[in-house]
């Protein structure tokens, strides 16, 4: 999902993940209505929220160990999967750092690891590439590609149009709270950037004189 700040991307993700009730209509995931099957759906749902959702007083590894039992993982299963994810996301060295003391990039990678821990069938990711170093971004791209190949459904938001052009099989562009475009970038002559700016407009900024001196 693409769109300018305030277009409604994060709100839509919160509705899809059950964190907010829709004003009308229903959310179905895997053919099940969220309001009737919330517990079952959440077991197969991985969410990277805008606010990240970390336990601020816990370390990185403690955050991962805390969510494992929620998804029915044993302590040993959680520890093994956490070790794999910490290695992949370059978090092993900082695994004993308290979340509130971590950099933004470390915090986001921790939240992503928490979302991936139970190998969910559906992933709802709010800006997984933003604020991430290039090496980790490449790993995340590889991970999401592998999960998609294995049958996972991944819905993510991003402002990095080049990444979206590279990985997306479907692009939805939101503008002022409405879906303005829904297309497969591989079947259109226009690139993602061209379609995006044709909808939201390409800015023509003028730098004020006082910033020039």
For each predicted feature, which ranges?
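Conserved ABC transporter NBD signature motif
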Residues: 25-33, 41, 181-183
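Conserved catalytic motifs of ABC-family nucleotide-binding domains
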Residues: 119
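Helix-to-loop junction immediately C-terminal to a conserved catalytic motif
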Residues: 17
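Conserved ABC ATPase "signature" region
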Residues: 65, 69, 76-94
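Catalytic Walker B motif of ABC-type/P-loop ATPase nucleotide-binding domains
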Residues: 123-126
């Amino acid at each position: 999902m693409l769109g300018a700040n305030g277009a409604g991307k994060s709100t839509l993700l919160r509705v899809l993940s059950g964190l907010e009730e829709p004003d009308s209509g229903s959310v179905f995931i895997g053919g099940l209505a969220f309001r009737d099957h919330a517990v079952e759906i959440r077991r197969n749902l991985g969410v990277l929220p805008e606010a990240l959702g970390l336990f601020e007083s816990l370390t990185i590894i403690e955050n991962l160990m805390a969510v494992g039992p929620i998804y029915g993982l044993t302590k040993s299963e959680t520890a093994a999967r956490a070790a794999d994810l910490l290695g992949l996301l370059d978090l092993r060295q900082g695994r004993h750092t308290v979340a509130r003391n971590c950099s933004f990039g470390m915090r986001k990678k921790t939240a992503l690891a928490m979302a991936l821990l139970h190998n969910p069938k559906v992933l709802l990711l709010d800006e997984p590439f933003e604020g991430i170093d290039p090496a980790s971004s490449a790993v995340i791209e590889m991970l999401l590609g592998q999960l998609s190949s294995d049958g996972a459904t991944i819905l993510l938001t991003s402002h990095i149009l080049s990444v979206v052009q590279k990985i997306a099989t479907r692009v939805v562009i939101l503008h002022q709270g409405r879906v303005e475009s829904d297309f497969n970038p591989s079947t259109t002559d226009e690139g993602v950037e061209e379609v995006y700016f044709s909808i939201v407009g390409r800015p023509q900024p003028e730098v004020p004189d006082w910033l020039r001196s």
